[in-house]
Curated annotation (Swiss-Prot):
GO cellular component, one term: extracellular region
Induction: Expression is highly up-regulated in invasive hyphae.
UniProt keyword list: Secreted, Signal
Encoding gene per record: BAS3
Protein name as annotated: Biotrophy-associated secreted protein 3
Source organism per UniProt: Pyricularia oryzae (strain 70-15 / ATCC MYA-4617 / FGSC 8958)
Subcellular location per the Swiss-Prot or TrEMBL entry: Secreted
Signal peptide per UniProt: 1-20
Keyword hit for Electron transport: no
Main location: secreted
Keyword Secreted: yes
Length: 113
């Protein structure tokens, strides 16, 4: 079998064409949700609004007291936290501001009425 000049030219430039093609980019991973375990003092928690379950919750985030609510089925926050922390007991709390979903493993245990 003989190669024509055109066939030879195609085989000669094919590797260069493949190398010039842009590589497939992998999807950009979502940034990790923040995880905070330190609870607010009771006096700070008492200032927080109640969640739909009538409990007040507060977490210390970088030295600041942040009120959080148990967002439950209203968002995918809890599911995302369970996946991220690889723990079925993980919880996700909703807030307003820079961190709309905050992960927590202790369930914001100082929650109370």
């Amino acid at each position: 079998m003989q190669f024509s000049t055109v066939s030879f030219a195609i085989f000669a430039i094919l590797p260069a064409m493949v190398a010039a093609m842009p590589a497939e980019t992998s999807p950009v991973p979502k940034p990790a949700l923040p995880v905070f375990e330190e609870l607010c003092p009771d006096a700070e928690r008492q200032k927080c609004a109640e969640s739909t379950d009538n409990l007040k919750r507060c977490l210390q985030i970088n030295g600041a007291s942040i009120c959080v609510i148990d967002c439950g089925s209203q968002t995918t926050c809890r599911t995302q936290c369970k996946q991220q922390l690889k723990n079925e007991k993980a919880n996700g709390f909703c807030t307003v501001g820079d961190n709309p979903c905050i992960c927590n493993l202790n369930g914001a245990a100082n929650s109370a009425h």
